[in-house]
Amino acid sequence: MKAMKQRIAKFSPVASFRNLCIAGSVTAATSLPAFAGVIDTSAVESAITDGQGDMKAIGGYIVGALVILAVAGLIYSMLRKA
């Protein structure tokens, strides 16, 4: 409790307001749409579009492997009980 009172006593509203102003101005400056126009994302978008087919195939293989493991687990548990 004493440590809490000491921290409250050290609290400086001026420094907190300054930090809040700095954080607000940095947020406002970096969230402007002007920065979004400078960065060219067409290469990234085309790479994502090209990779969609591969991702679907890989996802199919993963689902198939999980189904095989689930069936093997069921068969193993049934054989253990028998």
Curated annotation (Swiss-Prot):
SUPFAM superfamilies xrefs: Inovirus (filamentous phage) major coat protein (SSF57987)
Designated name of the protein: Capsid protein G8P
Gene: VIII
TM spans (from-to): 58-78
Source organism of this protein record: Pseudomonas phage Pf1 (Bacteriophage Pf1)
Keywords (A to Z) from UniProt: Capsid protein, Helical capsid protein, Host membrane, Membrane, Signal, Transmembrane, Transmembrane helix, Virion
Topology feature Cytoplasmic, residues: 79-82
Any one of the GO CC terms: membrane
Disulfide pattern: none
Description of how the protein assembles with itself and partners: Homomultimerizes. There are several thousands of this protein in the phage capsid.
Subcellular location: Virion; Host membrane
Function recorded in the entry: Self assembles to form a helical capsid wrapping up the viral genomic DNA. The capsid displays a filamentous structure with a length of 760-1950 nm and a width of 6-8 nm. The virion assembly and budding take place at the host inner membrane.
Matches recorded under InterPro entries: G8P
Membrane topology classification: Single-pass type I membrane protein
This protein's record includes keyword Membrane: yes
Family classification: Belongs to the inovirus capsid protein family.
Signal peptide: 1-28
Residue intervals on the Periplasmic side: 29-57
Keyword Metal-binding: no
